[in-house]
Structures are given as C-alpha cells and as structure tokens.
Regions:
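Hydrophobic beta-strand-centered segment that forms part of the acyl-chain substrate-binding groove
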Residues: 37-88, 104, 108-110
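Hot-dog-fold acyl-thioester-processing enzymes
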Residues: 1-56, 112-136
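Short, well-ordered turn and helix-capping elements at secondary-structure junctions
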Residues: 12-14, 60-66, 97
C-alpha cells in the first residue's frame, strides 16, 4: 500500500523538556517526507509554482501513538488517495528499532491553479493511480 519510504533520525534539538519529540516537529517530518517523495517522482514545487500551480495543505489529522526520543531512527511512509478535490497523503512513522507506530496522519492538500481551486493535477493523479495499483 505505501509507495514511498524515507529513513530519518531524531535530532536532540527536536525534543522537548520531557525528552521526546515535540508534537509540532512531527509535521516537519511529514512535510519533509512529502517533499522528498515528490522530488523522487520528478515533481518540483518551484517548477509547479512557475506554472501558476500551488499545492497547499488544507488540514492535517495526526494520531500520536509512541514517542520518539533523541537518536531514534525512524521510517516515514506514505501513499496518496483522493477525495473530491482533495489529495490525501496517508502517512505513518515507525520507530525503526522495534517497528512501533509513532504517528499516523492524514494530510489533506488542494491544488490552486492561477489562484483558483483546481479539481485535479495530472502529476498528482498519477501518484494516486500508483497508490491504488499497489493496494490491489
């Protein structure tokens, strides 16, 4: 089902006084994974923007399951679905040492072309199709 994986490591400064990754940092991990995923699929935000195309996050749902701590390596995974005009990046992060689920997230994104909400973007439709093919 997941069509992309990225391994990362927790840095000390990402943790709060409790010694765990601060909740806001997980959004950075999720965003970095999406950007690396798009880049791996030859999709550039800069090039899209130059064409008048902007992909924007409209909402994020995150369920926190197991905390990550300084030095933990983790695997961030994703696949893409679509609901109406929204592209849904379904993302999870697993702690590498024991494969425990750290977070589960749904990132809803929309595409705006020349300032107007678009119903689709061919580059993203291809990613949805690849996700669906992997699920079958």
């Amino acid at each position: 089902m997941y069509i992309y994986e990225l391994e990362l490591k927790v840095r000390d400064y990402e943790c709060d006084i409790q010694g765990v990754v601060n909740n806001s940092v997980y959004q950075n991990y999720l965003e970095h994974t999406r950007h690396e995923f798009l880049e791996a699929n030859n999709i550039s935000f800069a090039q899209l923007h130059d064409r008048g195309v902007d992909a924007m996050v409209s909402s994020i749902e995150i369920a926190y399951k197991t905390p990550l701590r300084p030095g933990d390596s983790f695997i961030s995974k994703l696949y893409v679905t679509k609901e109406g005009v929204r592209y849904i990046f379904n993302q999870v992060i697993y702690r590498k040492s024991d494969n425990k689920l750290a977070i589960k997230a749904k990132v809803h994104a929309v595409v705006v072309i020349d300032g107007k909400l678009a119903s689709s973007l061919p580059e993203f439709e291809e990613l949805v199709a690849r996700s669906q093919a992997k699920a079958e």
